[in-house]
């Protein structure tokens, strides 16, 4: 569960978040819509602990961001464009991320890639991926460790119709498993279908 109380954030004279208060429960998908610059990404980065609020608190599973914990740890995150090693395959990119973790094996990486529609055996390097393929890899990175919370900023940006449908299905399955999912989208249809 995430509890946001009176979250306020300014950049110079511009107030981006103004006394935002929300309670976000496990097992649900919450949609955030709005034009560019309205504060969706700032809110997501604040929840993650990447940006600190000027006023207010964000509590994740009973722990206050910036006080009890600095950065949320049990979350899969896509904020803006995910960064990858361009000269390596999708499998090698995920493998690199797991080198510091002992609990993720090659089979889990392969299953995750397949679940987002990427071929784990492909030797194609990420630098040659289309935008949609990079988005799929970003989603794979976010869900690979089976996180409790998913924070997804425009995860379907650049995907074709089939890709969008695939990702919607993945998100619905994760919701059924009790995950708390925050989804920013410019497409109201995504929000209508998923939330």
Predicted segments — roles?
Residues 139:
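Hydrophobic anchor residue at the start of the ABC signature
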Residues 48:
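Helix-to-loop junction immediately C-terminal to a conserved catalytic motif
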Residues 95, 106-121:
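Conserved ABC ATPase "signature" region
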Residues 150-154:
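Catalytic Walker B motif of ABC-type/P-loop ATPase nucleotide-binding domains
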Residues 56-71:
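Conserved ABC transporter NBD signature motif
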Residues 33-35:
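The feature captures the beta-strand-to-loop junction immediately N-terminal to the Walker
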């Amino acid at each position: 569960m995430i509890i946001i109380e009176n979250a306020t954030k300014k950049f110079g004279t511009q107030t981006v978040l103004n006394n935002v208060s929300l309670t976000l429960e496990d097992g649900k998908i919450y949609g955030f819509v709005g034009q560019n610059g309205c504060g969706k990404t700032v809110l997501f980065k604040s929840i993650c602990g990447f940006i600190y609020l000027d006023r207010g608190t964000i509590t994740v599973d009973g722990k206050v961001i910036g006080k009890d914990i600095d950065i949320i740890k049990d979350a899969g995150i896509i904020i803006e464009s995910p960064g990858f090693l361009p000269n390596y395959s999708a499998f090698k990119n995920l493998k690199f991320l797991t080198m510091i973790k002992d609990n993720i094996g090659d089979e889990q990486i392969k299953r995750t890639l397949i679940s987002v529609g990427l071929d784990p055996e492909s030797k194609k390097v990420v630098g040659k991926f289309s935008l949609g393929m990079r988005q799929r890899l970003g989603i794979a990175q976010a869900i690979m460790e089976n996180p409790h919370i998913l924070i997804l900023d425009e995860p379907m940006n650049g995907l074709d119709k089939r890709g969008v449908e695939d990702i919607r299905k993945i998100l619905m399955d994760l919701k059924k498993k009790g995950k708390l999912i925050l989804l920013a989208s410019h497409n109201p249809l995504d929000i209508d279908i998923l939330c």
